[in-house]
Amino acid sequence: KQTNTFLSLEKRHIDDLIPLCLNGNRHAQLEIYNRYYKGMYNVSYRIVKDSTIAEDVMQESLLSALTKLDQFKGEVSFGAWLKRIVVNNSIHQYKKRMKRQEVDLGNVMYKVEDNDGYVPDNGMIELKAQKVIETMKLLKDNYRISLTLHLIEGYDYEEIGEIMNLSYANCRTMISRAKES
């Protein structure tokens, strides 16, 4: 019977899984993890630029989201709420690591990757994408992070300002300057 319950969870909408998680259903929690871990890892990796740290941030963020699920009010989608947790934790970890200066920024590979891992065949598209990636690696950290959040993750200026503790005007200016750089 448990196998049938577990399999049926795969077809359930996220809004049906949340109440099960709140009641401590481990299968529902695992299903949420399975649905979101790849995407959240990629979000974190784009910010922290280290696969081990991104893995840790993703797991800590998912655990945090599941333990604080009662605070989820449904004002945004669960995925957007979880993504915000991952972004905030990723930025926190990145800043913490930079303070300790554990990594030489010049040696860190920054790679933009689709959630499904698709790599285009077209050589020209790949060449342009590689040029964009190389250019973004050269940007100051605040420019790189704000551009990543805006262009890749799809956050608007207000959300980025909130995440990075900037006013709306300063956020727009920073992104504009980052694009010019």
What are these regions (language model features)?
Residues 110-137:
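Acidic, proline/glycine-rich intrinsically disordered inter-domain spacer in sigma factors
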Residues 22-31, 41-60, 168:
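Short, charged helix-capping/linker segments at alpha-helix termini
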Residues 80, 91, 152, 158, ...:
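DNA-recognition helix of helix-turn-helix
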Residues 1-16, 135-142, 162-165:
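Intrinsic, short, N-terminal disordered tails of RNA polymerase sigma-factor systems
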Residues 22-23, 49, 60-77, 96-98:
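Sigma70-family region 2
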Residues 146-150:
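A short pre-motif secondary-structure segment
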Residues 42, 56-63, 76-88:
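Structural recognition of an alpha-helix C-terminal capping motif at a helix-to-coil junction
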